[in-house]
Amino acid sequence: MAVIKAVSSKAGIGQALDYVTKEEKTEDKLVSGLHCEPDTVKDEMAATKELWGKTGGRTYKHFVQSYHKDEHITPEQAHKNAVELAKNTEAWKGHEVLIATHIDRGHIHSHFIVNSVNYENGHKLQWSKADLQNLKDRCNEQSRQQGLHVPEKGKTFSGEEREETVAVSYTHLRAHETLANLV
């Protein structure tokens, strides 16, 4: 079962690239570049931004494709899947993308660092909820074709019903506590 998510980060692009390419996380072999070379990706992404005069604002988008710890997939196949997803993501056409598959935790996961500036036309990456859903759908189809689990909303990896959880904001929680103290 592979899950795709967009990562919100305050780290600069250099820090993000350094993190995802750490040798102990990737065994120094599960790193690929789409429209860039892994060894020179920082310079290439910076050059694209300089070329088009777009060095400010959001400098990259970060995504992760994670497999459940009990999924039967090799790190090499997970990396191959990630590269295939990146190549076929329409919104990423013309953007440098670094793909790094990590094997240092209990589950295999791949990071995608996407340059925010298109090297062909200088346009900034426009990413919508529909684009993310399309990426998730293609990831699910990839899993289906390989006989891997496909995530089902409200179910665990083994297919059992997940306990219902409720997300509460900190502000809402504090207001609730204040009301309880008044009573």
State where each predicted segment sits:
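N-terminal nicking endonuclease/strand-transfer module with a His-rich metal-binding environment
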Residues: 1-174
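Single conserved hydrophobic/aromatic residue that forms the stacking wall/gate
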Residues: 172-175, 179-183
